[in-house]
């Protein structure tokens, strides 16, 4: 075969191979089209891949993700309808407290991006519980954590994150600029209350579902402040208590009734020898009970209960098992302020059951260390110091801090009663731990159960100082 013939032969073979390859590709395309037509022939919709839709349904954010796999729509999440949290049930009967959450914020923050916080609290809707907290606009183990022992600054903000998680920039939601705050859910939306501004002119900003609805100006120009725990919603109305005036003497105390973020009624308490700060409130059979901090002259805790018309009653827990810190040794109580070691105090809570009371308190009389729950079967009305149950939560050798109540409604739990719960702040750093330049806290929480519970210590557990402190 001469060279020309070889060239012609090779060219012919190449052309033949190219034609065969082209025919195979065309056949493949026809096959895929036919297969797709068969699968979709009986359907009347067009498949869309990776379509992400966010809807707003009854004031509750619902997130749907549609992913088309072989023309089958897989939907994650489901519609959540709104309800009205009635708050008409009674508190559940309980015999003790089961550990619910522990976020280990300080331990995780030694290496991870975790906010410097204080004043954490928990509040629940009919769908979920969330941890709320006041940040310092800084992260642990970072230079901006220096000086965060200060209570009130323009860098503080109310934020929230999923329950039990360490609060970080990656899981937290901004709620309000605030150095004092409260939040609660009425079944249709979140009400947040954030107080910020100068001591002589602070303003409370009310938001409903994230939108500003009302503001309340300091009426005494003496550090307007609120609960540092959840407000209470009953039959569509939410209630909170604010204080304005001296922390070491008679001040002004107001109850606010709020509907969808708007104040519909308010009253000032007539309580000349009482002192109410940082109240821990809960619903019980349609009324609201608040147990508060007396920073003026009481080592027992003051209370105020009121109905939806704001008709109220006031008093002090009578038990000789004293609930504040600092406090004297347990002894004879009083239904008026117990003035021994009555100055100063710490945010706390109690739950009333008839004439009995569950008292949450630090284990130390003088320092914010340890925590325990005590059941005094006659402590709401009687002045003796006899109790029948004591449950340890944090050992006296470990730091605690603020504590407060929160509840889970039947709409969340499926129970026929309101479940009582509480949280404890575990403060670390300044002013007690001088090896650090910062102040922050983690938290634990418990819920009431009528079954077995444990006596133990669930401390913060972080090893200090951090790298930034050295």
UniProtKB/Swiss-Prot annotation:
Signal peptide residue numbers: none
Topology Intravirion: residue spans: 1-6
GO terms of biological process kind: carbohydrate metabolic process; viral budding from plasma membrane
EC number(s) stated in the UniProt entry for this protein: 3.2.1.18
Membrane topology designation: Single-pass type II membrane protein
Virion surface side: 28-470
GO molecular-function terms, A-Z: exo-alpha-sialidase activity; metal ion binding
Catalyzed reactions: Hydrolysis of alpha-(2->3)-, alpha-(2->6)-, alpha-(2->8)- glycosidic linkages of terminal sialic acid residues in oligosaccharides, glycoproteins, glycolipids, colominic acid and synthetic substrates
Post-translational modification, as annotated: N-glycosylated.
Reported regulation of activity: Inhibited by the neuraminidase inhibitors zanamivir (Relenza) and oseltamivir (Tamiflu). These drugs interfere with the release of progeny virus from infected cells and are effective against all influenza strains. Resistance to neuraminidase inhibitors is quite rare.
One GO location term (cellular component): host cell plasma membrane
Disulfide bond sites: 92-417, 124-129, 184-231, 233-238, 279-292, 281-290, 318-335, 421-447
UniProt-annotated binding residues for Ca(2+): 294, 298, 324
Chain spans, region Head of neuraminidase: 91-470
Xref: InterPro entries: Glyco_hydro_34, Sialidase_Influenza_A/B, Sialidase_sf
Active site: 151 (proton donor/acceptor), 402 (nucleophile)
Keyword Calcium assigned: yes
Membrane-spanning parts: 7-27
Task of the protein: Catalyzes the removal of terminal sialic acid residues from viral and cellular glycoconjugates. Cleaves off the terminal sialic acids on the glycosylated HA during virus budding to facilitate virus release. Additionally helps virus spread through the circulation by further removing sialic acids from the cell surface. These cleavages prevent self-aggregation and ensure the efficient spread of the progeny virus from cell to cell. Otherwise, infection would be limited to one round of replication.
Extra remark: The influenza A genome consist of 8 RNA segments. Genetic variation of hemagglutinin and/or neuraminidase genes results in the emergence of new influenza strains. The mechanism of variation can be the result of point mutations or the result of genetic reassortment between segments of two different strains.
Written domain comment of the UniProt record: Intact N-terminus is essential for virion morphogenesis. Possesses two apical sorting signals, one in the ectodomain, which is likely to be a glycan, and the other in the transmembrane domain. The transmembrane domain also plays a role in lipid raft association.
Assigned protein family: Belongs to the glycosyl hydrolase 34 family.
Full protein name: Neuraminidase
UniProt source species: Influenza A virus (strain A/USA:Texas/UR06-0195/2007 H1N1)
């Amino acid at each position: 075969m001469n060279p020309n013939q070889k060239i012609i032969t090779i060219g012919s073979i190449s052309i033949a191979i190219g034609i065969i390859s082209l025919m195979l590709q065309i056949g493949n395309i026809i096959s895929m089209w036919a297969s797709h037509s068969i699968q979709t022939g009986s359907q009347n919709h067009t498949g869309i891949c990776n379509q992400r839709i966010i809807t707003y349904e009854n004031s509750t954010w619902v997130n749907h993700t549609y992913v088309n796999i072989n023309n089958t729509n897989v939907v994650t999440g489901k519609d959540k309808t709104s309800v009205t949290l009635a708050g008409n049930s009674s508190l559940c009967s309980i015999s003790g407290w089961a550990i619910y959450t522990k976020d280990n914020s300080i331990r995780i923050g030694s290496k991870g991006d975790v906010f410097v916080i204080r004043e954490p609290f928990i509040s629940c809707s009919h769908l979920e519980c969330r941890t709320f907290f006041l940040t310092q606009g800084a992260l642990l183990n970072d230079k901006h954590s220096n000086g965060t022992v200060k209570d009130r600054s323009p860098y503080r903000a109310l934020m929230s994150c999923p329950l039990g998680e360490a609060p970080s920039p990656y899981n937290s939601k901004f709620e309000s600029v605030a150095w004092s705050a409260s939040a609660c859910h009425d079944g249709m939306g979140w009400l947040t209350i954030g107080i910020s501004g100068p001591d002589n002119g602070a303003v409370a900003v009310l938001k409903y579902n994230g939108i500003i609805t009302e503001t309340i100006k300091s009426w005494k120009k003496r550090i307007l402040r609120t609960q540092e725990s959840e407000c209470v919603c009953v039959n569509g109305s939410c209630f909170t208590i604010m204080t304005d005036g001296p922390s070491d003497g008679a001040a002004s105390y107001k109850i606010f009734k709020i509907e969808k973020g708007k104040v519909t009624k308010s009253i000032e308490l007539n309580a000349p020898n009482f002192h109410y700060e940082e109240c821990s409130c809960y619903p019980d059979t349609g009324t609201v009970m608040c147990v508060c901090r007396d920073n003026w002259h009481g080592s027992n805790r003051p209370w105020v209960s009121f109905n939806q018309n704001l008709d109220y009653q006031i008093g002090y827990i009578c038990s000789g098992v004293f609930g504040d810190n600092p406090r004297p040794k347990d002894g004879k109580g009083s239904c008026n302020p117990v003035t021994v070691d009555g100055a100063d105090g710490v945010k706390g809570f109690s739950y009333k059951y008839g004439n009995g009371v569950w008292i949450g308190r630090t284990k130390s009389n003088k320092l914010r260390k340890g925590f325990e729950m005590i059941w005094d079967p006659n402590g709401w009305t009687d002045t003796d110091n006899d109790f029948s149950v004591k449950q340890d939560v944090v050992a006296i050798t470990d730091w605690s801090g603020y504590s407060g109540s929160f509840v889970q409604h039947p709409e969340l739990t499926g129970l026929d009663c309101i479940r009582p719960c509480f949280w404890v702040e575990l403060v670390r750093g300044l002013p007690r731990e001088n090896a650090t330049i910062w102040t922050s806290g983690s938290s634990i929480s418990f819920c009431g159960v009528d079954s077995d519970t444990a006596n133990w210590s669930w401390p913060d557990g972080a090893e200090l100082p951090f790298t930034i402190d050295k």
